Amino acid sequence: MADKKSSPKKENPQDKTYAIVEASGKQFWLQPNRYYDFDRCQAEVDDVLTLENVLLLNDGKDLKLGKPYVKDAKVEIKVLEHRRGPKIIVYKMRPKKKTRRKNGHRQELTRVLVQSISIGSNTKKSKAVKTTASKVESE
């Protein structure tokens, strides 16, 4: 038998980058340049949203675990479309009672694309400037 030598796959650190975030009451494992379906959110198509509830972040070199959230971590997502999921049939039956009930529904979903996952110095912080109004005395 001849030995098959497989060429080593070049690992791209971008392939290893992922984050676990909390969104719409659930936890999602997100990777860059992939799309996911969330529960319907009140955003328009092509809006860019920022998720800051990052529970875990792996950037290919380092693994950061939040307590409960990773500080200064954010995930930017772009809303692609609003859609409906597959039809779900709910069938309830009581045996020997001739009672049957069949209902169905389709879940409202929002499809998003993960644009970037960043932490620390990569994030832009907006500084709030506090302004005070000066009193004008009338004579």
Curated annotation (Swiss-Prot):
Domain of life of the organism encoding this protein: Bacteria
Matches recorded under InterPro entries: bL21-like (IPR028909), bL21-like_sf (IPR036164), Ribosomal_bL21 (IPR001787), Ribosomal_bL21_CS (IPR018258)
Keyword Ligase applies: no
Keywords carried by this UniProt record: Ribonucleoprotein, Ribosomal protein, RNA-binding, rRNA-binding
Pfam families: Ribosomal_L21p
Coiled-coil region list: none
UniProt record, GO biological process: translation
Cross-referenced PROSITE patterns: RIBOSOMAL_L21
GO molecular function: rRNA binding; structural constituent of ribosome
Any single GO CC term annotated in Swiss-Prot or TrEMBL for this entry: ribosome
UniProt keyword Cytoplasm present: no
Quaternary structure and partners: Part of the 50S ribosomal subunit. Contacts protein L20.
NCBIfam families (alphabetical): L21 (TIGR00061)
UniProt cross-references to PANTHER family, sorted A to Z: 50S RIBOSOMAL PROTEIN L21, LARGE RIBOSOMAL SUBUNIT PROTEIN BL21M
Entry similarity comment: Belongs to the bacterial ribosomal protein bL21 family.
UniProt xrefs under HAMAP family: Ribosomal_bL21 (MF_01363)
Task of the protein: This protein binds to 23S rRNA in the presence of protein L20.
Protein name per Swiss-Prot or TrEMBL: Large ribosomal subunit protein bL21
Organism listed in the record: Prochlorococcus marinus (strain NATL2A)
